[in-house]
Amino acid sequence: RLGISSYTYTWAIGVPGSSPSNPLRVCGLLEKAISNGITVVQIADNLPLENLSEEETDLLRDFADAKGISLEIGGRGLIPGHVMKCLKTAEAIGSPILRMVIDTNNYEPEVPEIIAIIQELETEFRSRKIRMAIENHDRLKAREFENIIQSVGSEWVGICLDSVNSMGAGEGFETVSDILLPYTINLHIKDFTIRRVSHKMGIIIEGAPAGKGLLNIRDILSRASETGICKSAILELWTPPEKSIEETIIKEEKWAEESIQYLKSLKL
């Protein structure tokens, strides 16, 4: 199923050092899904839900249910107490997965510690029938993520496969997808372009609307569907900024609409 994310509209929500005057909030994100005919919304760590009150959480779930929207939750920081807080929120809103980015700005556990933490938490996920989806995110190589998944050895722990992040670890998506697709339970569709800088000594990797970049989206969706375990494909955007935050948000909105229409044309 095709979905959008709080990282589809990153600028509209706000990034450190650049906050819009009227930032997008959860209800606004759901309204964008409704207006675009999207039935899955992944609400990630840039729009955290774990601090909502029980009443606010219930209202969110009821609103989403009434509109026919399935919610997914994303967290950042594989710290047991924080993961449990996010997991309880995922349970409360009916999310089938908890997408987790391992690192934070000041927390980068080594692989053995990551494995130990996930093994400790696995029974909590299993008892709630919620899957932990570990996102490939910059620092670790694909084989290290594979080692984590194989070492834990649980159907309740898999991969959230992002199409661009592993370039931060020096790996292209073909390599990463070949290794991690068998474990992928959630897919981030993030198209991209690569161009040389003007002096030719270096390259720049930037986002692009889905279908306008280098990512072979049709192929990755076909391969993901063949595994039988990947249940949602979530659109994310890396929208290069314009001169003002207002212009950037307009561009981001246009890219989102273009991307959704393209992805719908693929008959997900």
Protein language model annotation of sequence segments:
Residues 213-220, 227, 231-237, 241:
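H/E-rich (His + Asp/Glu) clusters that bind or coordinate divalent metals
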Residues 8-10, 45-47, 77-79, 102-106, ...:
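Active-site-proximal loop/turn and secondary-structure-junction residues that shape catalytic pockets
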Residues 78, 236-247, 251:
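A short, acidic, flexible beta-alpha connecting loop/helix-capping segment that sits on the rim
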Residues 11-15, 106-108, 169, 241-246:
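A short acidic, helix-capping loop that chelates divalent metal ions and anchors anionic groups
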Residues 31, 56, 61-159:
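Active-site acidic/histidine proton-transfer and metal-coordination neighborhood
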Residues 3-7, 99, 182-195, 234-237:
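Non-cysteine beta-strand/loop elements that form the S-adenosyl-L-methionine
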Residues 41, 120-214:
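Acidic/histidine-rich catalytic cores of soluble enzymes
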Residues 1-96, 154, 182, 222, ...:
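N-terminal pre-domain/capping segments
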